[in-house]
Amino acid sequence: MNQLSQTFVLANEFKEGDLNVGGTRDDHVRREARGALAALSLGEIAKADFVEDQVTEALHRSLDPQLAGKVTHLTVADLKQILLSPEGAGWIERHRNGVSSEAAAAVVKIMTNEELATLSCKLFNPLPGDGIAIGSQGHFGSRIQPNSPGDDEDEILLSILEGLAYGCGDVILGLNPASDDVDTIIRLERLLQSVVERLELPTRFCVLSDIVKQTTARSQTKADVGFQSLAGTSKAILGMVALDVDGLLALAPGFDGLYFETGQGSAVTNQAAEDVDMVTLEARAYGVARLIQQQTGSWMIVNDVAGFIGPEVFRTGEQLLRACLEDTVMAKLHGITMGLDVCATFHMGIGPAELRTLTEQIVVQAAPAYLMAVAGNADPMLGYMTTSFREHPRLRRQTGRQITSAMQQRLIELSAMTESGTNADALYAAYQKAGGDTRSLDTLRDEGAKKIRTLAERGFDLGYGCDENHTRITGIYTNARRALYATLDEAVISDSSPRHFRAHSRSLDRDDFLAHPATGELITGEDMARIQALYPARRPQVQVVVSDGLNANAINENLRWVLPGVRRELLAAGHHVSEIDIVIENGRVRAGYHVGSLLEAEVIIHFIGERPGTGIDTLSAYLTYGLDDKGQSRWGSAAGFDHSWTTAVCGIHRRGKPPERAVEEIARLVARMFAQRCSGVALQSALGW
C-alpha cells in the first residue's frame, strides 16, 4: 500500500469493511488523515494510479484533459468549499468531467453527514422525459423488485401488479432471477415485457443477470435494459463476469438502456480490493459507469446496494446512513442518475423498525432518484430487508416528491394507484384482457384476487393493503434471528451421510462466527490434521462438505433430499466420490476451499445453509474445480482463494429450486467441470454462457 492509498483509507469514517485494507477505529488518526487529505491538490490525486488495471485506464479516459487542467490546482478543501457554495451545483455540472473519481472520493471523506446531505439535495441528474422525469428535483421513484425463490411466473406477475397499485415501478421493473441460465432469462424477460407492453407502462424492464448472458438471451428475445454489477478494480469485475472494462464497453452498446449495481464492501470481502478503501473503490466504480455512458450515450441508471453483505462491512445504522450519503454524493458528482437499495441482512442486528427510520432519513437527506420496492420488507429470494411497496406512498408524501408524470398519468388511466395498494386484481384483469382473454372483467378480477389470497396463504406478502396490524416482517425477523443460532440435526446428517467426519471452524462460538466471518473460513489446527489423515491411500475425485453456514435449518430441512441423490448420480457417472463427508460446525463458504486445500481434491461440493430471511430455509451448493489447466492444484490459501473460481447452485428448497432439479443441475455441472477442467466464471466462459 502506498502513502496516498493509506491516507485515503485512514481518512474514512469508520466501517468494519475498511479494516481489511488498513482502516482504523482511532478517531485521532482519522482526523489527522482527513487534514492531510484536505491539503492535497486534485492534480496530485489525478496523477496517482491507485491500481494498475483497466479500471484506472478507464478513469483516465473518462476525464476531459482541458477541464482537468482547470481544476488541477484546487485542493480537496477548495473543492469542498466550492461544492457547498450557492454556485456549487452549476460549477460541478460544468467541470465534472475534469474531476477524477478519486477526487470525488476524497472530498466526501472530509465532509460531515450534514454537509453531504446539503450537497446531495442540490445535485440532480435527470434522465430525458416530460414533466417530472426520473432523477429530477421533484421526483422520487422506485424499482419494483418482484423476486421469486423459484422464478414462478404467477408470483412475479402478482408482485409487479401489487407494486403498481402503490405507484411503484416508474423507474424500472427489475427481477433478480433465482436461476441464472439463459433459458430462464429469456422466459423472464418475456414475462416482464408482456407486463410493460400489455399495460402500456412508460417504464423499463430488466432481468438482472450479467451482461454476457443477457447478450446471449438478446438474440432470442427483447432485453430492454442491460445489467451488470460494477466494482472499483479489474480483479473484482473479472471475478463477476470474466470480462474487464473493455469487454463491458464492447457489449454495452447492444442495449438501449443500462442498469449498473454497485455497493461498498464487495471487493474488500472478496480479496479484490487491491489495498484500496471502500469509499474510493465505490467512486472508481462510478467512474467506469461514467465512461460507459459517455461512449454509448445510453439511458443509464445506477443503484447502490448498501447493507447487503453483512456486519463484516457495516455493523450499525449510523454506518449505513453514512455510506448512503457518501455514495449518493459521489455518484451525483459523476453525473449519474442514482438510486439506493437501503437494506440490511438479518445478521447485521438492524431490525425492521430501525431500518424504516433510516430509510426515511436517507430519502430526505440523500435525495436519491429511487429506492427498491418489494412486496414485503423481506425479499423472498435474496434474504434481506429493504423498502416495501407500502412505504412508498408515505415516503412520497414526506418528501413532497412524486413518481414520473408519465407513469402517474398511466396509472390514473388504469384506475390502479391507491394509497392502500388494493387494486392489483383490477390490474390483473386489465393484463389478461390485453393478452386476449375473453372472460368478463369481474371473472378476471375474482381470479386475480384468488391468486393473491393463495400466494398470501403460502407466505407471500401480498394482498394486505396498508393494515397497520400486519406484522409479518416482525415474524420473519424473529425467525431469521433464531435460525442464525440453529444447530445441525444429527439424525439428518446421519441419514444423508452415513459416514462423515465432524470438524470445527476457528470460530470460538456462534457469536464469534457471526461477528467475525473470517473465523468461520478455516478449520481448526487439530481437525486439519485429522482431515488430512482421512485418506491414507487414494483420495477421492469429489469431496463432499456440509456446513451449517448462516442457517443450519436449511441443512436440516433439505439435505436428505439432495445429498444422497447427488452421490448416486456422480457414482453412476463413474466418479470417485468421498466415502467420508466432512461436516463443519460454524462453517463459511471458504471453509470448503480449506478442505480442498487439505485434501488436494479435484472437485469440492459444499452444501451450506443460505442466510435466513426469505421466509423459507434455502440451501446452496458451491461446486469448485481445484486444478488449473496444467493439472496443478489451485487451492493454495483458502483465505485468498478467488470466489470467481466456484459455481453456486442456490435457492434449493421445495418452494424454490426443487431438490430433484438441484440434483440434476449439480450432477450436470460437475460433469462439465471435469470436461472443461474449470469452474466459476471460467466455466461460464468456456461454455459460452
Language-model-detected regions and their locations in the chain:
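Long, compositionally biased, glycine/small-hydrophobic-enriched stretches that function as flexible linkers
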Residues: 1-126, 437-452
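N-terminal small/glycine-rich loop or linker at the start of catalytic domains
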Residues: 50-55, 124-148, 260-272, 340
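Glycine-rich, proline-tolerant flexible connector loops at the mouths of alpha/beta enzymes
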Residues: 95-98, 108-112, 171-189, 304-317, ...
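N-terminal low-complexity, intrinsically disordered segments
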Residues: 117-119, 139, 458-536
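Alpha-helix-loop-beta-strand connector modules within alpha/beta enzyme cores
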Residues: 118-122, 136-137, 142, 182-210, ...
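Flexible, glycine/charged-enriched surface loops at secondary-structure junctions
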Residues: 200-203, 297-302, 335-337, 405-408, ...
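Catalytic alpha/beta core domains of metabolic enzymes, predominantly
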Residues: 216-375, 379-387, 396
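C-terminal functional extensions of proteins
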Residues: 280, 294-295, 301, 611-689
